[in-house]
Every structure is written in structure tokens, then in C-alpha cells.
A protein has these predicted regions:
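Juxtamembrane helix-loop boundary signature in multi-pass membrane transporters
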Residues: 1-5, 98-156, 265, 270-283
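Hydrophobic residues within alpha-helical transmembrane segments
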Residues: 2, 6, 33-37, 61-68, ...
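Structural signature of hydrophobic alpha-helical transmembrane segments
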Residues: 1-11, 54-70, 111-125, 173-187, ...
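Alpha-helical transmembrane segments of compact multi-pass small-molecule transporters, enriched
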Residues: 37-42, 92-106, 184-188, 223-226, ...
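Juxtamembrane helix-start motifs in multi-pass secondary transporters
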Residues: 30-31, 89, 177, 239
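Membrane-embedded alpha-helical core segments of multi-pass
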Residues: 10, 14, 41, 69-76, ...
Length: 283
């Protein structure tokens, strides 16, 4: 569970700063630069550890699926953050853990106990409450929020992609599994970038924007490393649920740096998250 919480710290920081950077240089440039840096850094880690990458060839199917779903998830997630509203996008995105848990139970044969399942459900509900303002949500339900379809797509993509990242980590070790997934994912971004080359060329990022996007990639990589380490030997379902608290980090940064004030339902959400994590720790 500790690794899942560390993953949440990295992903929550990347989420907050990714939203800020995405509105300056565009969501696609943000994700391409951030994940390009992550792939380079992951390669440096493999070179440093001297782990063999030959076993990757036996898992090309899982690697391809991880790349497709993860690349789709990142692109749609940053697009959802760019379009907003965050009050809708964030709680929907937090449900990715439920997708991954179902896959872990179905295909890995995991059988979390009643206490773990209860703790996971309470945690996810708490995250959804913490990451939104119910008053704004009710006020904005008269029409389809522009970011909602993108948020749903990203939740499914992250759930499936997270499952396959865990699968790769278990079979290849966290270093090679993490490296293979980052590089394969980058190939997916290259395809998207080529398809959108005209819009990318019309909005070239400045040096400051590139540096900020690299920072987003570094934070995201911290999350990926922690998640990979946790799922290599622990229950994938538990690590997934623990990592799903990442919106709390983004909310905390919004309070600290943007002066936002939490609303009552967010306090309730924090309490539920704490309760859910305690139940997971006792499971």
C-alpha cells in the first residue's frame, strides 16, 4: 500500500502541474514532452542497473496493449483537464482503480478479502468527493460537460493500462517492465503526434513551457516507478486503490498555491479516504 500512496504523490503532482502547463502550451505538447522525458529517464535507469531487456520479446502482446491504453489515457486525460470542468473530470478519473481491480480479480485470480474490498470502495468514494465541489457539479449538470467524455475514456485507459503495467512488472521486474511500458507508450504518442502535426506546428512551446512539461514527466515517472515496485510483489488491486488517491494531492496543491478553499463535501471525502486506507492497512 505504501508504494501505491507514493505513486499517488507523483501522479497527483503531475496532475496539478500538467493541468497548468497544458493550458499554456496545449495538452498534446505537454504529454509528448513529459512522456518523452520519462522514456529517456527510464532508459537511463535500465542502463545503470544493467538489467537484461531480452525477456521483453516474450511479452510483446501485453506491451502493445499497455502502450495503446496508456497512451490513449494520457492524451484524453490532459485533454479532459484542459476542457474541464475539474469538478467533473477529477472524480470520474479517480474511478480508473475500479477498472484495474476488476481486471486483477478476473485475470490474475486475486481475491481481496471483504475488509480490503470495503476499504477500496470507501477510498474511491472518498476520492471522488474530495476532488469535486458538489454545488458546482449540480449547477453544471444541465448539459454535457465538455471534458466528461474525455474523462471517461481516460479512466478506462488508465485502469487497463495500469493493469498491464502491473502485469509487465510481475513478469519482467519493475525496472524492465517500467522501461518497456514507457518506450512502447512513447511510440503511441509518436503516432498521435504525427496525426496532429499541423496543430502541433501551429503552437510550438516556448523554452519555459518545455521545462515545465519535463517537470510534469519527472513527477509522473516517480508515480510509475512506485506503482511498478508495489505491483511486482504485492496485490495489484490494493496498490491500484491506494494510488487512486492522487486527486487529493492535486486538491492540496490547489489549496496551497492557488488559494482555493475546500468545500464541506471535500472534508467528508478526506475523512472517507482516511477510513478506507485504514481498512486497507488492516486487511
Amino acid at each position: 500500500m505504501i508504494e501505491g500512496l507514493l505513486a499517488a504523490l507523483g501522479w497527483g503532482s503531475a496532475d496539478f502541474f500538467g493541468a497548468v502547463v497544458g493550458r499554456r502550451i496545449g495538452s498534446l505538447w505537454t504529454v509528448i514532452i513529459a512522456q518523452g522525458f520519462a522514456a529517456l529517464a527510464a532508459t537511463a535507469i535500465v542502463v545503470f542497473t544493467r538489467d537484461s531487456v531480452r525477456p521483453v520479446a516474450a511479452l510483446t502482446g501485453a506491451l502493445a496493449l499497455n502502450a495503446i491504453f496508456s497512451a490513449t489515457a494520457y492524451v484524453t486525460h490532459y485533454r479532459a483537464l484542459e476542457l474541464g470542468p475539474v469538478a467533473v473530470v477529477s472524480p470520474v478519473g479517480a474511478t480508473y482503480a475500479l477498472v484495474g481491480v476488476v481486471l486483477a480479480i478476473t485475470f490474475l485470480g486475486e481475491r481481496p478479502g471483504f475488509l480490503a474490498l470495503t476499504g477500496g470502495l470507501v477510498t474511491v468514494v472518498g476520492v471522488m468527493l474530495t476532488s469535486t465541489d458538489l454545488r458546482k457539479l449540480r449547477a453544471g449538470t444541465h448539459g454535457m460537460p465538455p471534458g466528461l467524455p474525455w474523462a471517461v475514456a481516460s479512466a478506462i485507459g488508465f485502469g487497463v493500462g495500469g493493469f498491464f503495467l502491473a502485469y509487465l512488472s510481475r513478469h519482467l521486474g519493475w525496472v524492465v517492465g517500467m522501461w518497456a511500458s514507457r518506450c512502447a507508450q512513447l511510440a503511441g504518442f509518436a503516432v498521435v503526434g504525427f496525426a496532429q502535426r499541423k496543430s502541433l506546428g501551429a503552437r510550438l512551446p516556448l523554452r519555459a513551457g518545455i521545462g515545465a512539461a519535463i517537470g510534469v514527466g519527472a513527477a509522473d515517472l516517480v508515480g510509475v516507478i512506485a506503482f511498478s515496485i508495489g505491483t511486482q510483489s504485492g496485490l495489484v488491486s490494493i496498490v491500484l486503490v491506494a494510488s487512486a488517491v492522487f486527486p487529493l494531492i492535486a486538491v492540496g496543491l490547489s489549496v496551497a498555491y492557488l488559494g482555493e478553499r475546500p468545500v464541506p463535501n471535500q472534508y467528508v471525502g478526506v475523512g472517507l479516504v482516511a477510513t478506507g486506507l485504514i481498512l486497507l492497512g488492516l486487511a
